[in-house]
């Protein structure tokens, strides 16, 4: 199921600014669902192979077990870039977020100060991606705070890896 209250395109002739108001996606069979006040998909007309996704400060996620999650953030964006050739091969994808909080209808909560996740095609090696992650100040749910060597928070996580597909 996919529903929305409005779809609007603005910004032309310099940009394509697609705003989807009150999107609601759900799979009644599996029980998964997602909704938000809006989603924006943005691109420059002179660079349509680079698309930006802007997400709202609050989103709702429904899980198959009946649990409802609220994802809050002060900033949450993603972008994907393709090579500007007729085949549009993948170039890079980035997800950036700040002030993230995930709370559950079952009473748990976790937070994340910042996150940057990236994947980039390695042009010198076929079927190879370079992956990166920078995560700062992860606060885990109270139920996990007493796990040895974990504690109530992770101060930082950094990943720089190459993956051959």
Language-model features and meaning:
Residues 146-165:
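Solvent-exposed beta-strand/coil patches in large extracellular/periplasmic or lumenal scaffold regions
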Residues 2-128, 136-139:
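N-terminal beta-strand/beta-hairpin edge segment
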Residues 131:
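Catalytic-site microenvironment of enzymes
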Residues 140-144:
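Outer-membrane beta-barrel proteins
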């Amino acid at each position: 199921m996919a529903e929305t209250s409005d779809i609007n395109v603005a910004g032309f002739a310099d940009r394509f600014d697609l705003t989807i108001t009150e999107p609601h996606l759900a799979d009644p069979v599996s029980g998964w669902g997602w909704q938000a006040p809006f989603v924006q998909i943005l691109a420059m007309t002179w660079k349509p192979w680079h698309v930006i996704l802007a997400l709202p400060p609050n989103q709702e996620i429904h899980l198959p077990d009946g649990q409802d999650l609220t994802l809050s953030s002060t900033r949450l964006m993603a972008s994907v870039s393709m090579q500007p050739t007729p085949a549009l091969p993948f170039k890079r994808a980035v997800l950036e977020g700040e002030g993230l909080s995930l709370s559950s209808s079952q009473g748990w909560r976790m937070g994340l100060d910042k996150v940057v996740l990236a994947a980039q095609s390695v042009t010198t090696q076929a079927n190879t991606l370079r992956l990166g992650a920078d995560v700062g100040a992860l606060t885990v749910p109270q139920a996990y705070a007493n796990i040895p060597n974990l504690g109530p928070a992770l101060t930082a996580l950094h990943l720089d890896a190459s993956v051959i597909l």
